[in-house]
Amino acid sequence: YSETRLPEVPSAILEMLSHQSFPDMRIAQDPLGKFYIARSIYKTILRFVNSNHGTRYVVQPLAPQNFSVTQNQGVALLSWTAQLDKTEPSARPTSYIIYKAEGQGGFDNGTIVNTTRCQMQLEPGKLYHFKVAAVNAGGESFTTETLSVLYNPAASKSVLIVNNFHRLASPQVVDDEEKQGFDFDQDPGVSYGLTAGWSGKQQVFDRSRMGN
């Protein structure tokens, strides 16, 4: 390809998966597979550019884990844990950004903290939303899920909401002697955030008609 033989900017052709290999397509449709591939490409580009300039690279951290919010007498306690990248020591977070939204408003520009715990004062009757991102010299991670809290001084009891749904999945896999593919009608899957990875549902599953 002339784009890589005669490039005006550094370029490369990445061939990681084959659209003719169903095991490869299962990886390509897996949200975690997409994330790992994208992050490995990002790391490679980062190392290439920094090595050309003779500078030390730092990989951006992964999103925090185990995020929780509790409140006591109008004070919200936010806590989380760091998610370490076992393949990249430089990706360790050095600080965190707490994003806050009040009522129907959008999120603010964030507050930087250096610990994995933080207290926030709450106004009675106002709904608050929080999310946290990890930060280091390499950049900012994806955020945690958004958690909400409301302080009602007149309440006699508290309500605890636990999100026990952390599933990520491709569309339903169909793979037997006669059929093969991804059935969106049976299960569209759960992507890692918004995705534009499809241009429509698979219509034909018959193995004998593949390639026609």
Predicted stretch roles:
Residues Y1-N52:
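Active-site-adjacent mobile loop/cap segments within catalytic or ligand-binding domains
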Residues F22-D24, P89, R167-V173:
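Short, solvent-exposed loop/turn elements at domain surfaces
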Residues R47-A91, P124, G138-K157:
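Pro/Thr/Ser/Gly-rich low-complexity, intrinsically disordered linker/stalk tracts
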Residues T94-I98:
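Short beta-strand elements bearing conserved aromatic residues within extracellular beta-rich modules
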Residues Y99-G103, V162:
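Predominantly extracellular/luminal cell-surface or secreted proteins
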Residues D108-T115:
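Short beta-strand segments within Ig-like beta-sandwich modules, predominantly Fibronectin type-III
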Residues Q119-S141:
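Beta-strand-rich modules
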Residues E145-N212:
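Aromatic-Pro/Gly-enriched surface loop or interdomain linker
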